[in-house]
């Protein structure tokens, strides 16, 4: 039990240190790349098209590298509960710098206690947005269908803007 508590505390401390480091680097914002509204909109539109082609109704949330909502799209008829989940998926992808599916795998295997960290989603549909240098620019979260379909829509959005992510 004590070992699980130590691991959980380690995860919480890691999340806090990551947040503090993000704040410390915020003053250098003008020097680092960022996610533009144009790119976020194009990403959401591509994810929207994929969902329409698949015959599913979803919410699409795109956040910047600080986890702040940058662009949001709700398809007509998408389930109400999926609104917040889409935003939490996008946030998780940024905060953990991994897809939400990968975060789920970590919570099962490597790091007991991560499931206790608030606002982290541990199933598919959230993907970090990275530029060609691997820098985190934001996250996309899709929710309203199965985790596999949500992830496919998020990936379609990301794939559509690869050339815009410098």
Regions found by a protein language model. Give the residues of each.
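Flexible, solvent-exposed loop/hinge segments and secondary-structure transition points
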Residues: 27-166
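N-terminal secretory signal peptides that target proteins for export/translocation
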Residues: 1-8
């Amino acid at each position: 039990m004590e070992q699980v508590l130590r691991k959980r505390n380690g995860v919480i401390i890691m999340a806090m240190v990551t947040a503090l480091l993000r704040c410390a680097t915020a003053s250098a914002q003008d020097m680092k790349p960022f996610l533009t509204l144009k790119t976020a909109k194009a990403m959401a539109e591509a994810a929207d098209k994929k969902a329409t082609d698949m015959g599913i109704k979803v919410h699409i949330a795109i956040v910047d590298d600080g986890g702040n909502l940058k662009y949001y799209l709700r398809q007509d008829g998408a389930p109400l509960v999926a609104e917040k989940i889409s935003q939490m998926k996008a946030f998780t992808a940024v905060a953990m710098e991994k897809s939400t599916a990968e975060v789920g795998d970590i919570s099962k295997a490597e790091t007991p206690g991560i499931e206790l960290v608030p606002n982290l989603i541990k199933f598919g549909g959230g993907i970090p947005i990275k530029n060609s240098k691997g820098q985190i620019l934001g996250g996309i979260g899709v929710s309203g269908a199965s985790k596999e379909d949500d992830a496919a829509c998020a990936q379609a959005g990301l794939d559509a803007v690869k050339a815009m992510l410098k």
